[in-house]
Amino acid sequence: MQLNINDEIYNIDQIDSNRKLLWVLRDELGLIGTRYGCGAGFCGACTVHINGQPTRSCIIPVSAIAPDARIRTVEGLAENGNLHPVQQAFIELQVPQCGCCMSGQMMSATALLEKDPNPSREDIRSAMKSNYCRCGCYQRIALAVERAAKLMP
Protein backbone atom coordinates (compact mmCIF):
# COMPACT_ATOMS: atom_id res chain seq x y z
CA MET A 1 0.00 0.00 0.00
CA GLN A 2 1.13 3.52 -0.72
CA LEU A 3 0.07 6.78 0.88
CA ASN A 4 0.39 10.25 -0.63
CA ILE A 5 1.32 12.43 2.33
CA ASN A 6 2.26 16.07 1.80
CA ASP A 7 2.76 15.28 -1.91
CA GLU A 8 5.28 12.52 -1.20
CA ILE A 9 4.57 8.86 -1.81
CA TYR A 10 5.26 6.50 1.10
CA ASN A 11 5.28 2.73 0.72
CA ILE A 12 3.71 1.18 3.82
CA ASP A 13 3.44 -2.45 2.71
CA GLN A 14 5.17 -3.65 5.88
CA ILE A 15 2.70 -1.86 8.18
CA ASP A 16 -0.41 -3.49 9.66
CA SER A 17 -3.30 -2.16 7.56
CA ASN A 18 -5.46 -1.84 10.68
CA ARG A 19 -2.99 0.53 12.31
CA LYS A 20 -4.40 4.01 12.85
CA LEU A 21 -3.10 6.72 10.54
CA LEU A 22 -1.86 8.79 13.50
CA TRP A 23 0.58 6.09 14.56
CA VAL A 24 1.74 5.42 11.01
CA LEU A 25 2.47 9.13 10.61
CA ARG A 26 4.27 9.48 13.93
CA ASP A 27 5.95 6.13 14.56
CA GLU A 28 6.60 4.79 11.07
CA LEU A 29 7.11 7.92 8.98
CA GLY A 30 8.52 10.35 11.55
CA LEU A 31 5.87 13.01 10.90
CA ILE A 32 5.42 13.94 14.54
CA GLY A 33 3.59 17.25 14.08
CA THR A 34 0.24 15.49 14.25
CA ARG A 35 -0.55 15.07 17.94
CA TYR A 36 -2.19 12.42 20.06
CA GLY A 37 -4.86 13.86 22.33
CA CYS A 38 -7.66 11.48 23.25
CA GLY A 39 -7.38 8.50 20.93
CA ALA A 40 -11.14 8.51 20.38
CA GLY A 41 -11.60 11.21 17.73
CA PHE A 42 -13.15 13.75 20.09
CA CYS A 43 -10.51 16.38 20.81
CA GLY A 44 -9.18 17.20 17.33
CA ALA A 45 -5.46 17.25 18.21
CA CYS A 46 -4.81 14.57 15.57
CA THR A 47 -6.59 16.36 12.71
CA VAL A 48 -5.12 15.96 9.23
CA HIS A 49 -6.64 16.58 5.82
CA ILE A 50 -7.66 13.70 3.61
CA ASN A 51 -8.62 15.06 0.20
CA GLY A 52 -9.07 18.47 1.82
CA GLN A 53 -11.41 17.26 4.55
CA PRO A 54 -10.41 17.56 8.22
CA THR A 55 -10.11 13.99 9.50
CA ARG A 56 -9.28 12.55 12.92
CA SER A 57 -6.20 10.43 12.27
CA CYS A 58 -6.39 8.63 15.63
CA ILE A 59 -9.48 6.67 14.61
CA ILE A 60 -8.98 5.94 10.92
CA PRO A 61 -7.07 2.79 9.99
CA VAL A 62 -4.80 3.13 6.98
CA SER A 63 -6.83 0.40 5.26
CA ALA A 64 -9.80 2.81 5.16
CA ILE A 65 -7.88 5.38 3.12
CA ALA A 66 -8.51 5.28 -0.63
CA PRO A 67 -5.41 4.52 -2.72
CA ASP A 68 -5.67 7.85 -4.55
CA ALA A 69 -6.25 9.92 -1.39
CA ARG A 70 -4.08 12.95 -0.67
CA ILE A 71 -3.17 13.35 2.98
CA ARG A 72 -1.85 16.63 4.35
CA THR A 73 -0.38 17.03 7.81
CA VAL A 74 0.74 20.16 9.62
CA GLU A 75 4.21 19.56 8.15
CA GLY A 76 2.66 20.00 4.70
CA LEU A 77 1.19 23.45 5.32
CA ALA A 78 4.35 25.48 4.71
CA GLU A 79 5.41 25.84 1.07
CA ASN A 80 8.85 26.65 -0.31
CA GLY A 81 10.14 27.44 3.16
CA ASN A 82 7.36 29.96 3.83
CA LEU A 83 4.90 29.47 6.65
CA HIS A 84 1.27 29.02 5.71
CA PRO A 85 -0.82 32.10 6.64
CA VAL A 86 -2.51 30.10 9.40
CA GLN A 87 0.85 29.17 10.91
CA GLN A 88 2.03 32.77 10.62
CA ALA A 89 -1.12 34.12 12.29
CA PHE A 90 -0.90 31.63 15.17
CA ILE A 91 2.69 32.76 15.79
CA GLU A 92 1.94 36.49 15.43
CA LEU A 93 -0.93 36.29 17.92
CA GLN A 94 0.98 33.97 20.28
CA VAL A 95 -1.86 31.47 20.31
CA PRO A 96 -0.15 28.38 21.76
CA GLN A 97 0.32 27.86 25.45
CA CYS A 98 0.98 24.16 25.96
CA GLY A 99 0.81 23.49 22.20
CA CYS A 100 -0.91 20.11 22.48
CA CYS A 101 -3.85 21.07 20.28
CA MET A 102 -2.13 23.48 17.89
CA SER A 103 -1.49 21.21 14.91
CA GLY A 104 -5.13 20.10 14.93
CA GLN A 105 -6.35 23.67 15.40
CA MET A 106 -4.24 24.84 12.45
CA MET A 107 -5.43 21.99 10.23
CA SER A 108 -9.09 22.74 11.00
CA ALA A 109 -8.53 26.47 10.46
CA THR A 110 -6.82 25.81 7.14
CA ALA A 111 -9.68 23.61 5.95
CA LEU A 112 -12.15 26.34 6.87
CA LEU A 113 -10.23 29.08 5.06
CA GLU A 114 -9.77 26.95 1.95
CA LYS A 115 -13.54 26.48 1.85
CA ASP A 116 -14.50 29.99 2.99
CA PRO A 117 -11.76 32.62 2.62
CA ASN A 118 -13.71 35.25 4.57
CA PRO A 119 -15.53 33.50 7.42
CA SER A 120 -17.58 35.33 10.03
CA ARG A 121 -16.75 34.86 13.71
CA GLU A 122 -19.72 32.50 13.95
CA ASP A 123 -18.42 30.49 10.98
CA ILE A 124 -15.06 30.23 12.74
CA ARG A 125 -16.66 29.10 15.99
CA SER A 126 -18.73 26.52 14.16
CA ALA A 127 -15.79 25.13 12.18
CA MET A 128 -13.50 25.01 15.21
CA LYS A 129 -15.96 23.86 17.88
CA SER A 130 -14.86 20.24 17.82
CA ASN A 131 -11.21 21.12 18.41
CA TYR A 132 -10.56 21.31 22.12
CA CYS A 133 -7.93 23.50 23.78
CA ARG A 134 -6.85 22.48 27.28
CA CYS A 135 -5.58 25.99 27.94
CA GLY A 136 -8.77 27.77 26.86
CA CYS A 137 -7.17 29.85 24.10
CA TYR A 138 -10.37 29.95 22.05
CA GLN A 139 -10.47 33.75 21.74
CA ARG A 140 -6.88 33.89 20.44
CA ILE A 141 -7.56 30.97 18.10
CA ALA A 142 -10.55 32.81 16.58
CA LEU A 143 -8.49 36.00 16.24
CA ALA A 144 -5.71 34.03 14.56
CA VAL A 145 -8.14 32.52 12.05
CA GLU A 146 -9.44 36.02 11.25
CA ARG A 147 -5.85 37.24 10.86
CA ALA A 148 -4.97 34.27 8.65
CA ALA A 149 -7.94 35.07 6.40
CA LYS A 150 -6.39 38.50 5.79
CA LEU A 151 -2.98 36.95 5.09
CA MET A 152 -4.29 34.35 2.62
CA PRO A 153 -3.31 35.03 -1.00
Question: Could you say what each language-model-derived stretch is?
Answer:
Residues M1-P153:
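Signature of N-terminal electron-transfer/Fe-S-associated modules in redox systems
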